[in-house]
């Protein structure tokens, strides 16, 4: 039979509380450092990239977890257009920063019920606003994702007053999408 743990002393509690507060402060500082400053005027471009099925088999920063040719083309485009204002739409983790460490996962919005996609979209839109990229009316949000990812939430961003662009909306198929990204790189 196991012996119950001894209760913490006041000194141990104080040390744990201090460690917790220091860790929280460090996490907040790291999060704040990832959010770019807001330019004084003009539109603020943000790029949202949809996740892809092909993933590495070990945990990695989100932008390295996805490994398909389509992902590489999307990522290269985002790094040219808005390198400090790029986020990832993840079926498994909602909205993530490219440097967030993610484990491999098998989840897709394809085949999900409308209610589940709507709940996902609510979480994504709510999380997006927390990044504080700037006043909603100045945000131009480019969404690079399949319809099952775009459709549930782009209207929410528009409702908040953001301009939403869907440059790949009429382009069907992975090959034509990669060709679009290649053409943008050449321009």
Where are these regions (language model features)?
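Peripheral peptide segments
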Residues: 2-187
